[in-house]
Structure formats: C-alpha cells, structure tokens
Amino acid sequence: MRIDHIRQRLRASGAKPCHEQRVLRAWTHALPLDRGRCRSEDFFPAPLGARLPALGAELAALAQVRSEHAGEDGARLLVELADGQTVESVLLPRDGLCVSTQVGCAVGCAFCMTGRDGLLRQLGSAEIVAQVVLARSRRAVRKVVFMGMGEPAHNLDNVLEAIALLGTEGGIGHKNLVFSTVGDRRVFERLPQGSVKPALALSLHTTRPALRTKLMPRAPRLDPAELVELGETYARATGYPIQYQWTLLAGVNDDDEELDGIVRLLAGKYAVMNFIPYNSVAGAGFARPSWEHAAAMARYLHRRGILTKLRHSAGQDVDGGCGQLRARVIASGALGQPAEAAPDRVVLVRRGQA
C-alpha cells in the first residue's frame, strides 16, 4: 500500500485537507483519533467517519511484530507484513529507529546477509511508515534512518513518499530522516527536489575503486571520488553533513593506505566518517578488527581533521546484524508458525467502536 492510495481513499470518503492531515497525523504518531476532549464524530464528515475503522484495520495489518530481540544497543524487531514476508526494524538509542525499505536486496554486498537471496519485493511507502508506527506504539521515535534491509535508491518513489509524510504529519525533523544509499545518481537528482530534504548517508567502505566493486558487485559504478563530490554538493545545498558509512573488515579496508585515501577524499569536506566494525555473517569470509585497532584508526583521522565516529554495529550481541535475524527465523522454519500476539496494533476508531 502507498500513502498516496490512503490519501485518495480519504478524499473519496469526503475528507478535506484538514481531515486528511488529522488522520495521517494520528496514524504516524500511533495515537487514537479520540484524544481528551477531541471526539472524531464531532470533527469528521459522517461518510468518512463510517469508513475509518475499516481503514484503520488495514493500516494495522500492514506490519506486526512477529518477535522482539533485546540487545545492549537496542531491540531488533522482526516485522511481519500483510503477505507474510518479514523485514527487520531496530530500536536504536536516543529515540532512533532503523527501518527496512525492501524485502531482500539486489546490491549483494559481500559482507551483508540481506542480499544473499536477492530482491524479493519492494515495500510500499505505507509499509515503511508502518514500521515507525509500530515503534512509536512502544516508545518515542524522533529519528528514522533508512538503513535496514534493502537499498532505498532502488525503491525511490516509495521511500521518498514515506520521508515526505514522516517529515510533515509525522513530526520528524528533516535532518533526523537519514536516507542511506550505496550511491545512485538518481538519488542526487531527486532528493534536492523534495519539500522534505533528508540527511544523506553514503556507503563508502573503501577508497579503492576495484575493492569497492568487489565488496559491492551490483552497486552503480561510481568512483569513490565522484561519490564524495556528489555528496558534497548535496551537503552544501542542505546544510547537513554527509555521513560516510565504512564497515571495518580486518585485513581488507583497515590499513594505512585506506586511511590516507580517506584523508585525501574527505579533507575540507562537510562530512562525518562512521566506522562500523563488521557484524559477522556465517560463510562471508570476513572478520571484525579489534576495537583497539578501530579506535586507533578513528584517532588518526581526527588528528588529520576528519570528524570520525566509531559506532557499535546494532545487533552484534544477539547475532542480529541486518538480515541475520530474518535468515535465522527462515532457517528454523518459524515463519510458518503464528506470530506473537501484538497488543501494539494501531487502529483508527471512533469512541465506542473499539
């Protein structure tokens, strides 16, 4: 389901812009339409009010929590969609949330579990927002990063539609919506045109073109230097620094040559380098460098004027890196079993109809 389809249904039921905004605001904030002294039957046209319970049930069925896996750095949710497919969302520290944009992924990064089975299907914009609604039914969400399963650039229309809603009725600051991509020229064309301009995270991982092709075999053929220049143009236009993502792989992209390459590419740029130690994937053939080595790399870049953050990869303590939780559940055969009870379903109802 797409958000535009929801808007069309509301309008077909007699909704004016103020009614449409009220419904979408309540949904994106995981709130009932009846709050305090505000009664929906006093606000909505009768035909619209009569159709809201059915619409609310459809929205609630878009995404449900199949299982939750607590960890030191946040909880990972296995989210079941209406057709039985599953994706992962991660409740991050400081009211952050990581959402998925596809079931599977076509990029096939060598160090990632998600792309092993290829792309299964796109998520509709409403399914993307539904992950935020699920999270908000559990706790506050003030930042959303599009860094879960899938490549957002390969589902651009749906992702941008979700961003537009979250940055308006959803009440999330534009710089707290982070679009992550391996690099696609369409992203740099489309993002500046939107009314909501998100922050941008670029998957760099290496400064060496040949190694980048090996690590991300089906990513667009963008030279790292060109990718950085495209990012810099967007950063200067929006006023948000580009976040460069770098998965640290021991003996692969953690040597002095790479450090010098980072300095060469990012010196003077409006950028933040995020070092993320590799989250082990069985059979991938990579290893995580020691924390001490990773910290030394970050210190070196700091001394050279590159703002660098060393981040924990969410889910390391529960073997729940991107795609791993879903793969483990599929391997166990648990997807054929009923989902856990979901008390956090959000349904748009009028008072007295629940």
From Swiss-Prot:
Its main location: cytoplasm. Binds 1 [4Fe-4S] cluster. The cluster is coordinated with 3 cysteines and an exchangeable S-adenosyl-L-methionine. One of its GO terms (biological process) is tRNA methylation. The active site is at 88 (proton acceptor), 322 (s-methylcysteine intermediate). Its cofactor is [4Fe-4S] cluster. Coiled coil: none annotated. Disulfide bonds join 98-322. It is an enzyme of class 2 (transferase). Keywords: 4Fe-4S, Cytoplasm, Disulfide bond, Iron, Iron-sulfur, Metal-binding, Methyltransferase, S-adenosyl-L-methionine, Transferase. Residues 91-317 form the Radical SAM core domain. GO terms for molecular function: 4 iron, 4 sulfur cluster binding; metal ion binding; RNA methyltransferase activity. [4Fe-4S] cluster binds at residues 105, 109, 112. Its EC number is 2.1.1.-. One of its GO terms (cellular component) is cytoplasm. S-adenosyl-L-methionine binds at residues 150-151, 180, 203-205, 279. InterPro entries: Aldolase_TIM, Methyltransferase_A, rRNA_lsu_MTrfase_RlmN/Cfr, rSAM. NCBIfam families: PRK14464.1. PANTHER family: 23S RRNA METHYLTRANSFERASE, RADICAL SAM CORE DOMAIN-CONTAINING PROTEIN. Belongs to the radical SAM superfamily. RlmN family. This is Probable RNA methyltransferase AZOSEA28700.
